[in-house]
Amino acid sequence: MGGILQKSRFVIHLDNGLFNEAVLFDRTNLLIDFPLGRCDTVIDFGQINGVVYTSEFKNEREVEFSPLKNQEKQELLNLFTNQSDETQQKSLVESLFQLAGKRAFYPIDDNDVRKYFRRTVEDMTDAQRKHCFEHIDQYYKVIKKKIDCLAGNYAEKEFFRQREKDALMMQAMYSFKTSIAPTELATSLGKSLYEREGKISDFETMMLRKILEDNGVNLRWWHRNDSKKGFCINSFINHFPDFVLLTEQGTVVALETKGEQLDGAGSKDRIRAGKDWEKAANALNDGRKYRYMMAFNQERLEGAYDVAAMLDLLRSL
């Protein structure tokens, strides 16, 4: 079974003077020169409110929060308010960095992250610093989202810049195993690649049944792709399609099925990355055709499919 199908992924070629070697491309390569220090600190903290917590740093990666009583809250606020502006800023920066932990934004350097926290805090008014102190965990989440967004935008631009320069190439780098042993099993359905496939959700089962029960779809097999160790589209984001399908005509389909609540910005990124993978894989001219599809029960995003459109396309493959 291991020789049934190989799937293509992006690689970079390294030349050490003796021979040229293809190395699997890693998204972190895109962020090595990410200039976080030149990025804006325009962040909307307007939605933050709620209970004040005290935090206990158990280790580098784990923080425990406990709600404060009114008296404790007031005592801490008084201590913070009576500090100088510079001391307040240092305190907030240190708390934010402790919440992040070391190498939280790898490969972005920790010093650059700390400096970004400082610039963000320095932009705050007295009232904003006090509010940040009261809701430090929520502020961290908002700042983290901002950094992730900045890094994501940079990674996408850098990825396509390298694609234009042919610095990234497509090559068969993933093969299916001869057998799998899922810890949780899916409902037994026909035409699965393996005797038993890994667990799938009720929504995924419903979408898969629609495909299998459609008389016009000629499927050779389907496989539930493992979300951690399976086939990954290694683009400006790394993501694992829910299913890999092979049609009788030899078309390989990377299929993602999305519930209606999962149609945010992340899905848009996946569609762009998936369509680029499709284009690059087909350019190999290896005798197969490749398709990337994201399907909703009802179409919600540009570039995605509803059930009817998904089935209509699969019938033609």
Show the residue positions of the predicted features:
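Catalytic cores and motor modules of nucleic-acid processing enzymes
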Residues: 1-240, 245-254, 262, 266-272, ...
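Conserved protein-kinase N-lobe ATP-binding Lys motif
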Residues: 259
